[in-house]
């Protein structure tokens, strides 16, 4: 330790030359630090055991927190693995001996590989998995055109959003689709080979009304007609209108009869208010003339024989005067209404 020795020499020389600067300080007070002895856990266990009066005869081995038994694998041969057994020969090359998990596997190993579960649940995966896009409308509002491509999602994101990626919330939302259509009367090869688009000509945009496909959900189709020119300079036919058929002028020799229309008689139903039911009145009620309704009369079930005077005394029925009625003409109809006497308190 030469460096340490030189340092000691320098300190001694400096203390001898300038003791007021390099001398030891006089007011060095040594602090009294109290060392706390850490109480061991064994002492607490011994104290608790002595307090409970339980004596442990044997010392137990330290237990693991998780009792891991390992991967339970059935002895099912892994698909594509060849096993060669030649009795009497020993494997000379130990590194060539395959491991147990390499030869045998679970019975659903192919399903695990397809679903990326079990021993295949490692590595990088897609953020969203395989998303299935379903077009909401496959109708063709232009019958003269035929679809060449399927409906593809229209990229409407900006360049910065494309770098960062699509947001997680935007995957479940609706996205616009695009589909290329060509005229039916032209061959697809002619359209693709002799197609020439002039960027100076603005395309014709036609916005169609919203088509309802589900409750609270609609699809709006926007037709963008791009004018296309051939190599010869002629404008190609984009959408052909149906050709009008000519009507042949001919003479009809058979006589023409007007069609006979069978008319059914219309049934007329009377007003419900004018229909009165058949009803039976109580014997104490005098029927009003002009209205339906009869007084209730008891049917004679057996021929009554004339007997002598009965002991029961019957009261004589008072002869009621006929009801006073009055005729009222209302809307050309004559109504027979009973005359009513009001209470003196009623005006």
UniProtKB/Swiss-Prot annotation:
Where is the protein situated, by its record's location annotation?
Virion; Host nucleus, Host nucleolus
GO CC terms in record: host cell nucleolus; virion component
| General function of this protein | Associates loosely with the viral DNA to form an outer shell around the nucleoprotein-DNA complex and links it with the capsid by binding the endosome lysis protein. Dissociates from the viral genome during entry. Might be involved in nuclear capsid assembly of the viral particles through its association with NPM1/nucleophosmin.
**What domain of life does the native source organism fall in?**
Viruses
Protein name, as recorded:
Core-capsid bridging protein
Q: What else is known?
A: All late proteins expressed from the major late promoter are produced by alternative splicing and alternative polyadenylation of the same gene giving rise to non-overlapping ORFs. A leader sequence is present in the N-terminus of all these mRNAs and is recognized by the viral shutoff protein to provide expression although conventional translation via ribosome scanning from the cap has been shut off in the host cell. This protein is only encoded by mastadenoviruses, and may therefore play a role in mammals tropism.
Species of origin reads: Human adenovirus A serotype 12
InterPro entries in the cross-refs: Adeno_V
According to the entry, what is the taxonomic lineage of the organism?
A: Viruses, Varidnaviria, Bamfordvirae, Preplasmiviricota, Tectiliviricetes
Short name of any one Pfam family annotated for the protein: Adeno_PV
Q: Name one GO molecular function term.
A: DNA binding
Listed under GO biological process in this entry are:
viral release from host cell
Q: Which of UniProt's keywords are assigned here?
A: DNA-binding, Host nucleus, Late protein, Viral capsid assembly, Viral release from host cell, Virion
User: Which factors induce or repress this protein, as stated in its UniProt record?
Assistant: Expressed in the late phase of the viral replicative cycle.
Positions of region (Disordered): 290-320
Q: Which family does it belong to?
A: Belongs to the adenoviridae core-capsid bridging protein family.
| Record field: compositional bias (Basic residues) | 304-318
Q: How does it assemble?
A: Monomer. Homodimer. Exists in equilibrium between monomers and dimers in solution. Interacts with the histone-like nucleoprotein; this interactions bridge the virus core to the capsid. Interacts with core protein X; this interactions bridge the virus core to the capsid. Interacts with the endosome lysis protein VI; this interactions bridge the virus core to the capsid. Interacts with the peripentonal hexons. Interacts with host NPM1; this interaction might play a role in virus assembly.
């Amino acid at each position: 330790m030469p460096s340490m020795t030189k340092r000691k020499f320098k300190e001694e020389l400096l203390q001898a030359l300038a003791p007021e600067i390099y001398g030891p300080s006089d007011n060095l007070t040594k602090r009294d630090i109290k060392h706390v002895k850490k109480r061991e856990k064994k002492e607490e266990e011994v104290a608790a055991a002595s307090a409970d009066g339980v004596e442990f005869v044997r010392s137990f081995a330290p237990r693991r927190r998780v009792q891991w038994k390992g991967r339970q694998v059935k002895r099912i041969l892994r698909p594509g693995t060849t096993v060669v057994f030649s009795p009497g020969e020993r494997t000379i090359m130990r590194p060539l001996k395959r491991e147990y998990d390499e030869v045998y596997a679970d019975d659903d190993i192919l399903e695990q590989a397809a679903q990326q579960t079990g021993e295949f649940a490692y590595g990088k995966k897609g953020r969203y998995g395989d998303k299935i896009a379903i077009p909401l409308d496959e109708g063709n509002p232009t019958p003269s055109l035929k679809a060449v491509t399927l409906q593809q999602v229209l990229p409407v994101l900006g360049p910065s959003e494309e770098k960062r990626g699509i947001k997680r919330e935007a995957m479940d939302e609706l996205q616009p689709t695009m589909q290329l259509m060509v005229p039916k009367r032209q061959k697809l090869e002619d359209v693709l080979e002799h197609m020439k688009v002039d960027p100076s000509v603005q395309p014709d945009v036609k916005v169609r009304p919203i088509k309802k496909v589900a409750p609270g959900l609609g699809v709006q189709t926007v037709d963008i007609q791009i004018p296309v020119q051939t190599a010869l300079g002629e404008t190609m036919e984009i959408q052909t209108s149906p050709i009008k058929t000519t009507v042949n002028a001919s003479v009809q020799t058979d006589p023409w009869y007007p069609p006979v229309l069978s008319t059914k008689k219309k049934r007329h139903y009377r007003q419900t208010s004018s229909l009165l039911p058949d009803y039976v009145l109580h014997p104490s009620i005098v029927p009003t003339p002009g209205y339906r309704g009869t007084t209730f009369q008891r049917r004679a079930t057996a021929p009554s024989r004339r007997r002598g005077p009965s002991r029961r005394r019957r009261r004589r029925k008072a002869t009621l005067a006929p009801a006073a009625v009055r005729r009222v003409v209302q809307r050309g109809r004559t109504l027979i209404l009973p005359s009513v006497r009001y209470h003196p308190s009623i005006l």
